[in-house]
Swiss-Prot record:
InterPro entries: RHOGAP6/36. Its main location: cytoplasm. This is Rho GTPase-activating protein 6. GTPase activator for the Rho-type GTPases by converting them to an inactive GDP-bound state. Could regulate the interactions of signaling molecules with the actin cytoskeleton. Promotes continuous elongation of cytoplasmic processes during cell motility and simultaneous retraction of the cell body changing the cell morphology. Keywords: Cytoplasm, GTPase activation. The lineage of its organism: Eukaryota, Metazoa, Chordata, Craniata, Vertebrata. GO terms for molecular function: GTPase activator activity.
């Protein structure tokens, strides 16, 4: 799919698929936070989810 965002000022950002192993530690941590938040907001799993330490 096309993962491109365009701003009103004409700037654009395009996301490309990458292997998760190639992400930096900071990128992995942020991805984990986003996934955790989405699980809580979008799904009623009926169980407690905790972030690994």
């Amino acid at each position: 799919g096309d993962f491109t965002w365009n701003s009103l000022s004409g700037r654009s950002v395009r996301l490309a698929p990458v292997d998760i192993q190639s992400l930096s530690e900071l990128e992995r941590a942020r991805l984990q936070e986003v996934a955790f938040t989405r699980l809580h907001q979008d799904y009623d799993l009926g169980c407690q989810i905790t972030m690994p330490k």
